[in-house]
UniProtKB/Swiss-Prot annotation:
Keyword presence, Iron-sulfur: no
Keywords: Cytoplasm, Endonuclease, Hydrolase, Magnesium, Metal-binding, Nuclease
Catalysed reactions, semicolon-separated: Endonucleolytic cleavage to 5'-phosphomonoester
Domain of life assignment: Bacteria
One Gene Ontology biological process: DNA replication, removal of RNA primer
Every RNase H type-1 domain range: 1-141
Protein name: Ribonuclease H
One GO cellular component, as annotated: cytoplasm
Cofactor entry: Mg(2+)
Listed EC numbers: 3.1.26.4
């Protein structure tokens, strides 16, 4: 099974507003950068999209070290999701889970891989997290039609 490192980030100008996601996938000496954006979204949705699209980019099941600066994503996948599923995608308070469409997509993708979810402090100078942030901001620009 291949081992892949993934660094993800999401960005949003205003929240909600135009947003973008970015990810870097590293396998050995090979790197792949992906990004995208949406005109009307939230930062949390873009953080989720970064992880979903990065995992979708893998052509086969892999051992993955996925780094995110989003506690929402990391805690959601490692602590909260199991109970959400048991409760029919409801929170402990009985409310519908926010962004359930993306959580369900992430759940589907994560089941294809052996993933270790890692947290990295955002904007702390970590080079690969900073690159993921740059890609997310490119996604915002693309959504706004500002890329040339």
């Amino acid at each position: 099974m291949k081992t892949v490192e993934i660094y993800t980030d999401g960005a949003c100008k205003k929240n909600p507003g135009p947003g973008g996601w970015g990810a870097i996938l590293i396998y050995g000496k090979n790197e792949k950068e992906i990004y995208g954006g949406e005109l009307d979204t939230t930062n949390n949705r873009m953080e989720l999209m970064a992880a979903i699209e990065a995992l979708r980019a893998l052509k086969q099941g892999c051992k993955v070290e996925l780094y995110t600066d989003s506690q929402y994503v990391r805690k959601g996948i490692t602590e909260w999701m199991q109970n959400w599923i048991k409760k029919g995608w409801r929170t402990s308070g009985g409310d519908p889970v926010k962004n359930v469409d993306l959580w369900q997509a992430l759940d589907k993708e994560r089941n294809k891989h052996d993933i270790s979810w890692r947290w990295v402090k955002g904007h702390s100078g970590h080079p690969l997290n900073e690159r993921a942030d740059e890609l997310a901001n490119l996604g915002v620009k693309e959504a706004l039609g500002e890329t040339g």
